[in-house]
Amino acid sequence: MPDNVALFATTILILPMFYLLLAAPAFLLVKLNVTPVARLLRGMFNSYFIVLTIAGVIGTAAVVMTGRWGLAIGFGLMTALAATSRRWFLERMNFDIEQEAIDADVAHRMRRLHWGGMLANAVQLAAVIACIPYISVAPA
């Protein structure tokens, strides 16, 4: 019989990941040397990491209440990864947003971070989805 709390917690964790999977590729079609576009990209990743951290805390709390400590540790690690990734990622994406135009080096660095963020999100999403059959039927 499936564990409804574990499936609920997993679904909460998957939603922000799925959002970024759909939203981030749109930035591949635009140049990142335009300041408003770069700000929007930075804001999207900032919001993603914040929402993923909040979703991870909610999921961890829900699983802890059911007494499934192994799963709670997994959710807690995913939450900690999101919180630390946000800081690391945004520190590298910072630039002078008051500039009229962004130079090519900064745009290239942002493009690499964009690809890296999309890849990391896809790997995490695939890992969480691959674990659903094991999460939903694991004993307490």
Where are these regions (language model features)?
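Polytopic transmembrane helical bundles with strong interfacial aromatic enrichment
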Residues: 1-140
